[in-house]
Amino acid sequence: MRVLLTDPSAFTPTYDHELAAALARAGAEVELVTSRFRFGDAPAPEGYTRSERFYPLSSRLFRRSRLRLPLKAAEHPLGLAALRRRPADVLHLQWLAAPELDVHLFRPHAPAVFTAHDLLPRRTARKADLWRRLLARFERIVVHSERGRETLAALGVDSSRLRVVPHPVFPSDPERRDDGRTVLSFGVIRPYKGLRDAIEAVRRAGDARLLVAGDPLEPLEPYRAAADGLEVEWRLGYLPQPEVDRALGEATVAVFPYRPELDQSGALLRALGAGVPAVAYDVGGVAEPVRRFGAGRVVPPGDVEALAAALRELLSDREALEQARAGARRAREELTWDAAARAHLELYEEIA
Protein backbone atom coordinates (compact mmCIF):
# COMPACT_ATOMS: atom_id res chain seq x y z
CA MET A 1 0.00 0.00 0.00
CA ARG A 2 1.33 3.43 -0.95
CA VAL A 3 0.65 6.01 1.76
CA LEU A 4 1.09 9.72 1.12
CA LEU A 5 1.65 11.25 4.56
CA THR A 6 1.37 15.03 4.46
CA ASP A 7 2.33 17.82 6.87
CA PRO A 8 2.47 20.93 4.64
CA SER A 9 3.94 23.34 7.21
CA ALA A 10 6.19 20.82 8.99
CA PHE A 11 4.30 21.52 12.20
CA THR A 12 5.20 18.16 13.76
CA PRO A 13 8.32 16.76 12.07
CA THR A 14 9.16 14.30 14.85
CA TYR A 15 5.62 12.88 14.90
CA ASP A 16 5.64 12.66 11.09
CA HIS A 17 8.97 10.85 11.13
CA GLU A 18 8.03 8.34 13.82
CA LEU A 19 4.70 7.46 12.18
CA ALA A 20 6.20 7.22 8.68
CA ALA A 21 9.02 4.98 9.91
CA ALA A 22 6.61 2.73 11.82
CA LEU A 23 4.30 2.43 8.79
CA ALA A 24 7.32 1.50 6.67
CA ARG A 25 8.36 -1.15 9.20
CA ALA A 26 4.83 -2.55 8.95
CA GLY A 27 5.18 -2.95 5.18
CA ALA A 28 3.70 0.24 3.72
CA GLU A 29 5.37 2.30 1.02
CA VAL A 30 5.41 5.78 2.55
CA GLU A 31 6.21 9.22 1.18
CA LEU A 32 6.20 12.15 3.60
CA VAL A 33 5.26 15.34 1.74
CA THR A 34 6.10 18.42 3.75
CA SER A 35 8.15 21.64 3.72
CA ARG A 36 11.52 22.68 5.06
CA PHE A 37 11.53 22.69 8.87
CA ARG A 38 12.35 26.27 9.84
CA PHE A 39 13.86 25.62 13.28
CA GLY A 40 16.50 22.97 12.72
CA ASP A 41 17.16 19.69 10.98
CA ALA A 42 14.25 17.34 10.40
CA PRO A 43 14.83 13.67 11.30
CA ALA A 44 16.45 11.64 8.54
CA PRO A 45 14.01 9.23 6.83
CA GLU A 46 14.10 5.60 7.95
CA GLY A 47 12.48 3.31 5.39
CA TYR A 48 10.38 6.04 3.77
CA THR A 49 10.97 8.92 1.38
CA ARG A 50 10.63 12.60 2.24
CA SER A 51 9.90 15.38 -0.25
CA GLU A 52 9.63 19.12 0.40
CA ARG A 53 6.92 20.23 -2.03
CA PHE A 54 5.27 22.98 0.02
CA TYR A 55 6.48 26.57 0.59
CA PRO A 56 9.93 26.39 -1.05
CA LEU A 57 10.49 30.14 -0.70
CA SER A 58 8.69 31.22 2.47
CA SER A 59 10.15 28.38 4.53
CA ARG A 60 13.67 29.43 3.52
CA LEU A 61 13.51 33.21 3.36
CA PHE A 62 11.70 33.80 6.64
CA ARG A 63 11.84 32.07 10.00
CA ARG A 64 9.54 33.91 12.38
CA SER A 65 8.73 37.08 10.48
CA ARG A 66 5.06 37.61 9.68
CA LEU A 67 6.24 38.74 6.25
CA ARG A 68 6.35 35.08 5.27
CA LEU A 69 2.57 34.68 5.62
CA PRO A 70 1.50 36.44 2.36
CA LEU A 71 4.19 34.54 0.45
CA LYS A 72 3.13 31.29 2.11
CA ALA A 73 -0.49 31.91 1.09
CA ALA A 74 0.62 32.48 -2.50
CA GLU A 75 2.66 29.26 -2.47
CA HIS A 76 -0.07 27.12 -0.90
CA PRO A 77 -2.01 26.34 -4.13
CA LEU A 78 1.24 25.29 -5.79
CA GLY A 79 1.92 22.87 -2.96
CA LEU A 80 -1.57 21.38 -3.25
CA ALA A 81 -1.06 20.96 -7.00
CA ALA A 82 2.25 19.18 -6.38
CA LEU A 83 0.56 16.94 -3.83
CA ARG A 84 -2.13 15.93 -6.33
CA ARG A 85 0.57 14.72 -8.70
CA ARG A 86 1.91 12.20 -6.18
CA PRO A 87 0.46 8.67 -6.56
CA ALA A 88 -1.25 7.24 -3.49
CA ASP A 89 -3.57 4.50 -2.32
CA VAL A 90 -4.28 6.59 0.78
CA LEU A 91 -3.71 10.29 1.43
CA HIS A 92 -3.17 11.06 5.13
CA LEU A 93 -3.03 14.72 6.15
CA GLN A 94 -1.58 15.55 9.55
CA TRP A 95 -2.61 19.20 9.38
CA LEU A 96 -4.71 21.49 7.23
CA ALA A 97 -2.21 24.31 7.06
CA ALA A 98 -4.46 27.03 5.64
CA PRO A 99 -8.09 26.08 6.29
CA GLU A 100 -9.56 29.25 4.79
CA LEU A 101 -7.78 28.40 1.53
CA ASP A 102 -8.17 24.64 1.84
CA VAL A 103 -11.95 24.87 1.99
CA HIS A 104 -11.84 26.23 -1.57
CA LEU A 105 -8.75 24.50 -3.00
CA PHE A 106 -8.24 21.13 -1.32
CA ARG A 107 -9.82 18.16 -3.04
CA PRO A 108 -8.35 14.75 -2.14
CA HIS A 109 -7.15 12.74 -5.13
CA ALA A 110 -7.19 9.46 -3.15
CA PRO A 111 -9.15 8.06 -0.20
CA ALA A 112 -8.25 10.48 2.57
CA VAL A 113 -7.56 10.47 6.31
CA PHE A 114 -7.08 13.51 8.54
CA THR A 115 -5.52 13.54 11.99
CA ALA A 116 -7.15 16.22 14.15
CA HIS A 117 -4.18 16.89 16.42
CA ASP A 118 -5.69 20.11 17.76
CA LEU A 119 -9.32 19.13 17.01
CA LEU A 120 -10.25 22.65 15.85
CA PRO A 121 -7.08 24.76 15.65
CA ARG A 122 -7.17 27.84 17.85
CA ARG A 123 -7.09 30.48 15.11
CA THR A 124 -10.16 29.11 13.33
CA ALA A 125 -11.91 27.23 16.15
CA ARG A 126 -14.97 29.48 16.01
CA LYS A 127 -15.52 28.76 12.31
CA ALA A 128 -17.48 25.57 12.85
CA ASP A 129 -19.09 25.58 9.41
CA LEU A 130 -15.70 25.85 7.72
CA TRP A 131 -14.46 22.81 9.64
CA ARG A 132 -17.61 20.80 8.96
CA ARG A 133 -17.09 21.39 5.23
CA LEU A 134 -13.42 20.45 5.38
CA LEU A 135 -13.84 17.36 7.54
CA ALA A 136 -16.57 16.08 5.20
CA ARG A 137 -13.86 15.50 2.56
CA PHE A 138 -12.17 12.75 4.58
CA GLU A 139 -13.29 9.14 4.78
CA ARG A 140 -11.71 8.78 8.23
CA ILE A 141 -10.68 11.26 10.92
CA VAL A 142 -8.18 10.25 13.58
CA VAL A 143 -8.29 11.74 17.08
CA HIS A 144 -6.00 10.94 19.99
CA SER A 145 -8.59 10.59 22.76
CA GLU A 146 -12.18 9.72 23.58
CA ARG A 147 -12.77 13.37 24.41
CA GLY A 148 -11.56 14.24 20.94
CA ARG A 149 -14.06 11.81 19.46
CA GLU A 150 -16.86 13.37 21.52
CA THR A 151 -15.87 16.89 20.48
CA LEU A 152 -15.95 16.16 16.74
CA ALA A 153 -19.11 14.09 17.03
CA ALA A 154 -20.76 17.10 18.69
CA LEU A 155 -19.63 19.19 15.71
CA GLY A 156 -21.61 16.86 13.47
CA VAL A 157 -18.95 14.43 12.23
CA ASP A 158 -20.50 10.99 11.75
CA SER A 159 -19.14 8.68 14.45
CA SER A 160 -18.53 5.95 11.84
CA ARG A 161 -15.77 8.13 10.35
CA LEU A 162 -14.00 8.79 13.66
CA ARG A 163 -11.18 6.61 14.97
CA VAL A 164 -9.29 6.98 18.25
CA VAL A 165 -5.58 6.22 17.88
CA PRO A 166 -3.76 7.21 21.09
CA HIS A 167 -0.75 9.43 20.53
CA PRO A 168 2.38 7.32 21.13
CA VAL A 169 5.06 8.44 23.52
CA PHE A 170 8.44 9.66 22.29
CA PRO A 171 10.80 7.22 24.02
CA SER A 172 14.16 8.46 25.25
CA ASP A 173 16.70 7.58 27.93
CA PRO A 174 18.23 10.82 29.18
CA GLU A 175 20.87 10.71 31.87
CA ARG A 176 18.98 11.14 35.15
CA ARG A 177 20.27 14.13 37.07
CA ASP A 178 17.17 15.38 38.86
CA ASP A 179 17.56 16.83 42.33
CA GLY A 180 14.15 15.72 43.60
CA ARG A 181 12.68 19.23 43.45
CA THR A 182 12.75 20.35 39.80
CA VAL A 183 9.44 21.01 38.03
CA LEU A 184 9.74 21.17 34.24
CA SER A 185 7.55 23.37 32.06
CA PHE A 186 8.42 22.14 28.60
CA GLY A 187 7.45 23.05 25.06
CA VAL A 188 6.51 26.05 22.96
CA ILE A 189 5.46 28.98 25.14
CA ARG A 190 2.02 30.18 24.09
CA PRO A 191 -0.92 31.56 26.10
CA TYR A 192 -2.82 28.25 26.05
CA LYS A 193 0.11 26.42 27.70
CA GLY A 194 -0.67 28.03 31.08
CA LEU A 195 2.85 29.02 32.11
CA ARG A 196 1.52 31.60 34.57
CA ASP A 197 -0.38 28.84 36.41
CA ALA A 198 2.77 26.71 36.44
CA ILE A 199 4.74 29.57 38.00
CA GLU A 200 2.14 30.16 40.69
CA ALA A 201 1.76 26.44 41.44
CA VAL A 202 5.52 26.02 41.90
CA ARG A 203 5.55 29.06 44.19
CA ARG A 204 2.82 27.49 46.35
CA ALA A 205 4.36 24.02 46.27
CA GLY A 206 7.14 25.04 48.64
CA ASP A 207 10.69 23.82 48.17
CA ALA A 208 10.61 23.56 44.39
CA ARG A 209 12.62 24.80 41.44
CA LEU A 210 11.05 25.63 38.06
CA LEU A 211 12.83 24.84 34.80
CA VAL A 212 11.23 26.53 31.78
CA ALA A 213 12.52 24.93 28.59
CA GLY A 214 10.94 25.98 25.33
CA ASP A 215 10.50 28.39 22.47
CA PRO A 216 8.66 31.61 23.39
CA LEU A 217 6.09 32.69 20.82
CA GLU A 218 4.77 35.48 23.03
CA PRO A 219 6.39 38.18 25.21
CA LEU A 220 8.13 36.78 28.29
CA GLU A 221 8.16 39.91 30.46
CA PRO A 222 4.84 39.13 32.23
CA TYR A 223 6.06 35.64 33.06
CA ARG A 224 9.41 36.86 34.35
CA ALA A 225 7.59 39.37 36.55
CA ALA A 226 5.25 36.66 37.87
CA ALA A 227 8.27 34.49 38.70
CA ASP A 228 10.08 37.22 40.65
CA GLY A 229 11.59 35.75 43.81
CA LEU A 230 11.13 32.17 42.60
CA GLU A 231 14.00 29.83 41.76
CA VAL A 232 13.60 29.64 37.97
CA GLU A 233 15.92 28.68 35.15
CA TRP A 234 14.97 29.79 31.63
CA ARG A 235 16.26 27.77 28.66
CA LEU A 236 14.71 29.52 25.73
CA GLY A 237 14.54 28.94 22.00
CA TYR A 238 14.00 25.91 19.84
CA LEU A 239 15.89 23.20 21.73
CA PRO A 240 17.91 20.59 19.83
CA GLN A 241 17.50 17.00 20.99
CA PRO A 242 20.54 17.01 23.33
CA GLU A 243 19.06 20.01 25.17
CA VAL A 244 15.64 18.37 25.32
CA ASP A 245 17.27 15.29 26.84
CA ARG A 246 19.18 17.42 29.34
CA ALA A 247 15.98 19.13 30.50
CA LEU A 248 14.08 15.85 30.79
CA GLY A 249 16.99 14.30 32.68
CA GLU A 250 16.91 17.10 35.26
CA ALA A 251 13.13 17.01 35.74
CA THR A 252 11.60 15.41 38.80
CA VAL A 253 8.11 16.04 37.46
CA ALA A 254 6.67 17.94 34.48
CA VAL A 255 3.67 20.26 34.63
CA PHE A 256 1.01 20.80 31.95
CA PRO A 257 -1.61 23.39 33.02
CA TYR A 258 -3.06 23.67 29.52
CA ARG A 259 -6.20 25.47 28.48
CA PRO A 260 -8.99 23.34 26.93
CA GLU A 261 -8.01 23.98 23.30
CA LEU A 262 -6.20 20.84 22.19
CA ASP A 263 -6.58 17.08 22.14
CA GLN A 264 -3.11 15.90 23.12
CA SER A 265 0.34 17.20 23.99
CA GLY A 266 3.54 16.07 22.32
CA ALA A 267 5.51 17.67 25.16
CA LEU A 268 3.66 15.56 27.73
CA LEU A 269 4.34 12.40 25.73
CA ARG A 270 8.02 13.30 25.51
CA ALA A 271 8.05 13.58 29.30
CA LEU A 272 6.34 10.22 29.81
CA GLY A 273 8.64 8.65 27.21
CA ALA A 274 11.61 9.78 29.30
CA GLY A 275 10.09 8.36 32.49
CA VAL A 276 9.12 11.77 33.90
CA PRO A 277 5.73 11.88 35.69
CA ALA A 278 3.26 14.58 34.71
CA VAL A 279 0.84 16.81 36.57
CA ALA A 280 -1.84 18.04 34.18
CA TYR A 281 -5.12 19.86 34.03
CA ASP A 282 -8.02 17.65 33.00
CA VAL A 283 -8.50 19.14 29.53
CA GLY A 284 -9.01 17.56 26.12
CA GLY A 285 -7.25 14.23 25.94
CA VAL A 286 -4.16 15.50 27.75
CA ALA A 287 -5.11 13.78 31.00
CA GLU A 288 -6.00 10.42 29.46
CA PRO A 289 -2.52 8.79 29.41
CA VAL A 290 -1.67 10.23 32.84
CA ARG A 291 -4.84 8.83 34.36
CA ARG A 292 -4.82 5.55 32.42
CA PHE A 293 -1.29 4.57 33.42
CA GLY A 294 -1.08 6.29 36.80
CA ALA A 295 1.76 8.39 35.42
CA GLY A 296 1.27 11.41 37.66
CA ARG A 297 -1.69 13.48 38.79
CA VAL A 298 -4.71 15.03 37.06
CA VAL A 299 -6.40 18.07 38.59
CA PRO A 300 -9.40 20.23 37.65
CA PRO A 301 -8.74 22.83 34.93
CA GLY A 302 -7.73 26.21 36.29
CA ASP A 303 -7.36 25.00 39.89
CA VAL A 304 -3.90 26.32 40.72
CA GLU A 305 -4.12 25.21 44.34
CA ALA A 306 -4.85 21.62 43.26
CA LEU A 307 -1.95 21.87 40.81
CA ALA A 308 0.33 23.00 43.62
CA ALA A 309 -0.91 20.26 45.95
CA ALA A 310 -0.21 17.58 43.33
CA LEU A 311 3.30 18.92 42.79
CA ARG A 312 3.87 19.10 46.55
CA GLU A 313 2.79 15.47 46.96
CA LEU A 314 5.05 14.09 44.24
CA LEU A 315 8.03 16.16 45.35
CA SER A 316 7.69 15.24 49.03
CA ASP A 317 6.43 11.63 48.91
CA ARG A 318 9.09 9.33 47.48
CA GLU A 319 6.71 6.37 47.20
CA ALA A 320 4.12 8.41 45.28
CA LEU A 321 6.84 9.68 42.95
CA GLU A 322 8.15 6.17 42.26
CA GLN A 323 4.63 4.92 41.53
CA ALA A 324 4.13 7.77 39.05
CA ARG A 325 7.47 6.97 37.42
CA ALA A 326 6.36 3.35 37.05
CA GLY A 327 3.19 4.63 35.37
CA ALA A 328 5.28 6.63 32.90
CA ARG A 329 7.22 3.46 32.09
CA ARG A 330 3.94 1.58 31.49
CA ALA A 331 2.83 4.31 29.09
CA ARG A 332 6.12 3.96 27.23
CA GLU A 333 5.68 0.19 26.93
CA GLU A 334 2.12 0.36 25.61
CA LEU A 335 1.82 3.60 23.62
CA THR A 336 4.25 2.61 20.88
CA TRP A 337 4.64 3.82 17.32
CA ASP A 338 4.38 0.28 15.98
CA ALA A 339 0.98 -0.10 17.66
CA ALA A 340 -0.13 3.23 16.17
CA ALA A 341 1.07 2.13 12.72
CA ARG A 342 -0.98 -1.07 12.95
CA ALA A 343 -4.07 0.92 13.92
CA HIS A 344 -3.55 3.31 11.01
CA LEU A 345 -3.04 0.49 8.51
CA GLU A 346 -6.33 -1.07 9.63
CA LEU A 347 -8.25 2.11 8.90
CA TYR A 348 -6.36 2.61 5.62
CA GLU A 349 -7.54 -0.85 4.55
CA GLU A 350 -11.12 0.17 5.31
CA ILE A 351 -11.05 2.93 2.70
CA ALA A 352 -8.37 2.04 0.12
Language model features by range: what are they?
Residues 147, 168:
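Carbohydrate-associated surface elements
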Residues 6-74, 99, 148, 215-219:
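N-terminal strand-loop element at the rim of the active site
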Residues 75-76, 93-100, 116:
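Short His-centered aromatic/hydrophobic patch
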Residues 209-222, 237:
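Glycosyltransferase donor-sugar binding loop
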Residues 248-263, 276:
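Acidic donor-binding loop of glycosyltransferase active sites
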